[in-house]
Regions:
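Von Willebrand factor
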Residues: 5-61, 71-76, 91-94
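Conserved acidic
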Residues: 68
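Short amphipathic alpha-helical segments and helix-helix/interface helices
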Residues: 78-82
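Anion (oxyanion) recognition and catalysis
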Residues: 85
Length: 94
């Protein structure tokens, strides 16, 4: 989740079933505040898609971001997006 500061709620290797992952996602609560999308993307790049946390190098690295669509700092967000794209990450924004 993210607003002012991003927070990883769980890692890819924390759960072993689709049901457990769906339940973990359902338990995430909406958090009000700013939309520092750049900070969330930087966290994904540094920590989220890491083999130590369950990411596998032989599969596409996909991230889905659910946001209100208005980044607090569009310039920094574009910079983070370029870094992720340079590492061949696939991003979907909702």
């Amino acid at each position: 989740t993210f607003s002012d500061q991003p927070k990883i709620k769980f890692h890819l290797n924390d759960y072993t079933s689709k049901t457990a992952i769906a339940n973990a996602i359902s338990d995430i609560k909406w958090k009000g505040g700013n939309t520092f999308l750049d900070r969330a993307l930087a966290m994904v790049r540094r920590q989220g898609l890491n083999p130590r946390y369950g990411s596998r190098p032989d599969v596409p690295q996909i991230t889905v971001i659910i946001t209100d669509g208005v980044s607090t700092d569009p310039r920094k967000t574009r910079r983070e997006l370029k870094k992720l794209h340079a590492q061949n990450y696939i991003l979907y924004a909702i």
